[in-house]
Amino acid sequence: MPFQDVSAPVRGGILHTARLVHTSDLDQETREGARRMVIEAFEGDFSDADWEHALGGMHAFICHHGALIAHAAVVQRRLLYRDTALRCGYVEAVAVREDWRGQGLATAVMDAVEQVLRGAYQLGALSASDTARGMYLSRGWLPWQGPTSVLQPAGVTRTPEDDEGLFVLPVGLPAGMELDTTAEITCDWRDGDVW
């Protein structure tokens, strides 16, 4: 499976390199191992639909002696902001194995996916857990303060349960666009959690 090295933070004297690989280049064993690790890291609060959302884009992996210890993914979505459908890199499945937490591995996989965001998208977005909010704020991600919605088959529908969890990272907005994080934003439709 082809990997691209992206970042190599040193934590506790150990060098961990985040590697990028597209979903299409993952063999079945690696993909299934990543799914299991992410589900375990989320302590069961991560569904098959959540994993499905993480497929089809780039994955950042950190392995130690062949075992996956950290993961993040970025997939393409469209977010409607005012009259523009922004090309969005949506970050999914950011997870660090429990016995490796607190060593900067989440930072390393985020460095990798943010490199992808800056190279390919107009906007980064993610739905943050309460425990991860501080990390995203420290990296320059902006909490979305306006109303969220989804463009579902029946039309635009508000998603008030997601209003507090959305974060965005402007990386290449169209010329002249100012991002107002108090405005409404709408995501494209998908099964499971839409945000």
UniProtKB/Swiss-Prot annotation:
UniProt xrefs under SUPFAM superfamilies: Acyl-CoA N-acyltransferases (Nat)
- The positions annotated for binding CoA are 94-96, 101-106
Pinpoint the N-acetyltransferase domain residues.
21-180
Q: Name one GO biological process term.
A: response to antibiotic
Entry keyword set: Acyltransferase, Antibiotic resistance, Transferase
UniProt-annotated binding residues for substrate = 45, 92-93, 127, 161-162
Q: Write down the superkingdom of origin.
A: Bacteria
Record GO terms (molecular function): acyltransferase activity, transferring groups other than amino-acyl groups
Instruction: List the EC numbers from the record.
Output: 2.3.1.-
Q: Subunit structure of this entry?
A: Homodimer.
Q: NCBIfam families of this UniProt entry?
A: AAC_2p_Ib
Q: Hey, which family's this protein in?
A: Belongs to the AAC(2')-I acetyltransferase family.
What is the protein's known function?
A: Confers resistance to gentamicin, tobramycin, dibekacin, netilmicin, and 6'-N-ethylnetilmicin.
| This protein's name | Aminoglycoside 2'-N-acetyltransferase
From which source organism is this entry?
Answer: Mycolicibacterium fortuitum
